[in-house]
């Protein structure tokens, strides 16, 4: 994560663009402060990148020594903040992942697609991918539980904009 470069999203060497607005930057910085206050250890990032004075940039941030009771593990941050929570085994990892009121996105990090599939079927998120996040506007995107308000993308994303009309006609017309 420390090697990720923040900057102009039109620059091909950049992996992380700015947040959308000042309010969101302040919100993410508040979560970073809360993580520190609650005892999580900052391993990478946590500040504003140097040299990016225009825009709402925050460094990719990794917390370790996180447990599932901490705010940074319980809430959707919507910023480049990752909380690494240790698990005893695969079943414990699934339990931790599902112990949340949210379920927008998840990832299973493994080189074994069959194992990724088996774990993904147990995790209650609207989207889950092997080895990281993926997005395709042709496929529905949205969450479970308290995450999101429906689906974006794909046929499912169009359905809320449609009205069904049933018309009955006599065959003789």
Identify what each model region corresponds to.
Residues 11-17:
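Short linear capping/connector segments at secondary-structure termini
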Residues 8:
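Conserved donor-nucleotide binding/catalytic region of nucleotide-linked donor-dependent transferases
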Residues 41-47:
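Diglycine-centered glycine-rich loop/turn motifs
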């Amino acid at each position: 994560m420390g090697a990720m470069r923040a900057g102009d999203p039109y620059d091909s060497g950049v992996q992380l663009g700015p947040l959308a607005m000042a309010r969101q930057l302040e919100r993410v910085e508040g979560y970073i402060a809360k993580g520190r206050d609650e005892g999580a250890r900052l391993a990478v990032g946590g500040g504003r990148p140097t040299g990016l004075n225009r825009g709402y940039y925050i460094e990719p941030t990794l917390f370790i020594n996180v447990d599932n009771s901490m705010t940074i593990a319980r809430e959707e941050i919507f910023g480049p903040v990752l909380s690494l929570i240790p698990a005893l085994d695969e079943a414990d990892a699934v339990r931790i992942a599902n112990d949340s009121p949210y379920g927008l996105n998840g990832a299973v990090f493994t080189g074994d697609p069959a194992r990724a599939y088996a774990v993904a079927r147990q995790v209650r998120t609207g989207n889950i991918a092997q080895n990281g996040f993926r997005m395709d506007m042709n496929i529905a995107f949205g969450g479970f539980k308290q995450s999101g308000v429906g689906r974006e993308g794909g046929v499912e994303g169009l359905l809320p904009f449609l009205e069904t009309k049933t018309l009955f006609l006599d065959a003789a017309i």
